[in-house]
A protein has these predicted regions:
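Gly/Ser-rich oxyanion-binding loop with an adjacent helix/lid
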Residues: 1-22, 28-32, 38-41, 80, ...
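Glycine-rich phosphate-binding loop
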Residues: 342
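FabD-like malonyl-/acyl-CoA
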Residues: 132, 345-349
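C-terminal nucleotide
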Residues: 1-27, 52-88, 186-334, 349-389
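Short, charge-rich binding segments
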Residues: 44-46, 54-57, 89, 106
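Short Gly/aromatic-enriched secondary-structure transition segments
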Residues: 39-46, 228-229
């Protein structure tokens, strides 16, 4: 892939000078959904698919972007003096947002770039293609300008900062953290309240991770994501009148049951219940994985989906069909929606010998019920973002 991106760069912008290449993965969250902005735990991993970038510094302040995924847009031209969202169409907002964030954080971007990007993350799948683009841009800027004091965790935080403040998307830290800090064959047990984390080896003896992409189009900003977030913030404020906590992630299930009546609205109560119970499920799931109890891990994945469907109400017929059909397939250890919901994808752990049957059976049932096809990807857990040698 690296060579294809370099060839494309040379064709568009010429092959001379110091052209450098970078990679940032996509991510999937195994369990711990809609907990990252509620001060809870998440358990994501980086994937071996992601975003490749070739870049070269310019002597002026011009920016030239080309995406091999959006060839019809051609070369999109901009400048470091035009940090205005929406001027240049959708996708350059992610790299430009990261450049803006570096400037805001005291790391000036004084020269422009020629940039070619290629991503093999399915677009709109919910596997974090925009966070991957942000992170690969952050790695590039750190490398090109020699900003060695910036850590990979800083890059993740700058990515979140640019999403929140440049792109206007109220995301948590999970996506950028998983992409920046990923480790081969491990998932990251991350406490989003303080960014304490540990790597947990994912040993799926005789099984693999299968991503089922619903192909229902959704955008994070225009989905009900922000609505759920504000429902949880209101619920937290109501609980804080009777209990001294900073986030819903601090509550055990028992503590929540004791104070839940402080939440006046039954819908908000359900939202908060999901945040608390999902956090506990995530803690239990990591313990199960450490104990090599993959069956228990799968049960907790299934319970996570039920909660996202019934209490948090972020699934919809597409994701429910993918998951419920998966539950009926032989060899499926666990299956749940992953990501923000309202479309996007599901993650399943499937015994290797049953994968072909799983894809055929779930795929046929989905097409019959929904009217268009789902896509399936058997994925591996890879390392986080970095410079390609």
């Amino acid at each position: 892939m690296k060579q294809q991106v370099l060839d494309c760069f040379a064709k568009l912008f010429g092959g001379e000078g110091d052209i450098r290449t970078y990679f940032a993965p996509g991510r999937v969250n195994l369990i711990g959904e809609h907990t990252d902005y509620n001060g809870g735990h998440v358990f994501p991993c980086a994937l071996t698919i992601g975003t490749y970038m070739a870049a070269r510094k310019r002597d002026d302040r011009k920016l030239r972007f080309y995406s091999m995924n959006f060839e019809q847009l051609g070369v999109v031209e901009s400048s470091l003096d035009e940090f205005l969202m929406g001027k240049e169409g959708n996708w350059p907002a992610s790299p430009k947002g990261m450049m803006w964030a570096f400037c805001q954080k005291g790391f000036p971007v004084e020269q422009g770039f020629d940039i070619v990007l290629y991503g093999n993350i399915p677009n709109g799948s919910g596997l974090s293609s925009s966070a991957s683009v942000e992170t690969v841009t952050g790695v590039m800027l750190r490398d090109m300008f020699g900003y060695d004091t910036i850590s990979m965790i800083d890059i993740a935080l700058y990515g979140q900062f640019s999403e929140n403040n440049y792109n206007g998307v109220n995301c948590g830290i999970m996506d950028q953290f998983a992409i920046a800090m990923g480790k081969k064959d491990c998932a990251i047990f991350l406490d989003t309240s303080d960014l304490k984390y540990e790597y947990a080896p994912v040993k799926l003896e005789g099984a693999r991770i299968v991503i089922s992409c619903s192909n229902k189009k959704r955008g994070l900003g225009d989905s009900k994501y922000n609505e759920r977030r504000s429902e949880c913030e209101t619920a937290l404020a109501e609980i804080q009148k009777v209990k001294d906590i900073k986030s819903l992630g601090e509550l055990t299930e028992e503590e929540f049951e004791a104070v839940k009546d402080a939440i006046k609205d039954p819908v908000r109560q359900k939202r908060a219940k999901h945040a608390v119970y999902e956090n506990q499920r995530t803690v239990q799931a990591v313990a199960a994985l450490k104990a090599n109890d993959i069956a228990k891990f799968g049960e907790l994945m299934n319970a996570s989906h039920v909660s996202l469907r019934d209490d948090y109400e972020v699934t919809g017929i597409e994701l429910d069909t993918l998951v419920e059909e998966a539950w009926n397939c032989p060899g499926v250890i666990g299956s749940r929606m992953t990501g923000a919901g309202f479309g996007g994808c599901t993650v399943s752990i499937v015994k290797t010998e049953d994968i072909d049957n799983f894809i055929a059976k779930v795929g046929a049932a989905y097409k019959e019920k929904i009217g268009y096809a789902a896509d399936f990807y058997v994925v591996d857990i890879g390392d986080g973002a970095g410079v390609l040698k």
